C-alpha cells in the first residue's frame, strides 16, 4: 500500500483461534495487513496457512479472537452482525471458489436481487448490463444448473461488481475452472475491478494469477511470511 494513503482494510495484530477435538487451533497469529484504495493484493501460501480465514475476518464474516480489524475505517468489533452487513452492503463484495448462486433464481435475478435489497433503482436493468459486460447477454433467464462453471462464475462476478463496490474479496475465484476458462474469468475480474476502481484482496494458488496483482503476501502457519516470495512455489 502506498505510504500515507487511507486503508480500505486494515488488520492489526489479528489472531483467530478455533476449537477442535484435539484442542484450540491457532488459525491466524498476529497478522498485520493494510490494503489501500484501488490496490490489488494477492494472498498466497499452502493449504491450511490461514488465507481464507484472513478474508473471512477481513470481511467481517468471522470475528477475530484478538486484534483490530478496520473495514473502511470502521472497527468491526464495535458493530454487531447487522451492522457489519450494513457496512459491507454496496461497499464490499465477495466472490468464492464455489459460486454460491441461488439455484431457484435466473442469472439476471441472482445479480439484481442484492441491488434490490440495497434499495437500488433499476436493479434488473443494471443486472442485464452487467451480464452483458461479462459476456452473458444470452443467459439472462438461465438458471445456475443450466450454466457451465465458467458462466456461473461470471454471473457471480457480475453480482459482486454491479453495486460498484470499494473492495472485492475473491477466495480462489478460478479454483474450480479449467485453465482456459480460468484465464478468461481472471481477465474479466481484473478488467472490471479496474473499471469500478475497487481494491482487490484475492486468495489464490495460481502463480500466474497472483503475479497480476500489485502486491503479493504469503501466508505461512497463520502468519504473513516476510521472506522473499517465489510464486513458482506457491503450494510449497
What residues fall within each predicted segment?
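ABC-family P-loop ATPase nucleotide-binding domain
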Residues: 1-17, 226-236
Amino acid at each position: 500500500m502506498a505510504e500515507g494513503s487511507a486503508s480500505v482494510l486494515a488488520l492489526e495484530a489479528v489472531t483467530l483461534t478455533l476449537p477442535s477435538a484435539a484442542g484450540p487451533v491457532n488459525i491466524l497469529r498476529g497478522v498485520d495487513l493494510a490494503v489501500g484504495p484501488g490496490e490489488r493484493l494477492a494472498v498466497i501460501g499452502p493449504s491450511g496457512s490461514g488465507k481464507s480465514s484472513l478474508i473471512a475476518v477481513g470481511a467481517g464474516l468471522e470475528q477475530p479472537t484478538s486484534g483490530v480489524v478496520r473495514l473502511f475505517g470502521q472497527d468491526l468489533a464495535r458493530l454487531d452482525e447487522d451492522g457489519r452487513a450494513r457496512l459491507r452492503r454496496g461497499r464490499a463484495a465477495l466472490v468464492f471458489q464455489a459460486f454460491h448462486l441461488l439455484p431457484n433464481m435466473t442469472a439476471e435475478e441472482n445479480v439484481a436481487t442484492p441491488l434490490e435489497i440495497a434499495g437500488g433503482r433499476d436493479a434488473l436493468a443494471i443486472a442485464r448490463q452487467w451480464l452483458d459486460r461479462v459476456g452473458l447477454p444470452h443467459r439472462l433467464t438461465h438458471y445456475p444448473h443450466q450454466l457451465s462453471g465458467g458462466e456461473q462464475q461470471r454471473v457471480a462476478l457480475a453480482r459482486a461488481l454491479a453495486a460498484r463496490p470499494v473492495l472485492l474479496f475473491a477466495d480462489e475465484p478460478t479454483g474450480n475452472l479449467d485453465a482456459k476458462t480460468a484465464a478468461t474469468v481472471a481477465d474479466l475480474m481484473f478488467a472490471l475491478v479496474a473499471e469500478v476502481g475497487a481494491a482487490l484482496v484475492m486468495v489464490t494458488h495460481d502463480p500466474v494469477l497472483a503475479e497480476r496483482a500489485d502486491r503479493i503476501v504469503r501466508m505461512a502457519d497463520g502468519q504473513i511470511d516476510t521472506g522473499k516470495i517465489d510464486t513458482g512455489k506457491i503450494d510449497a
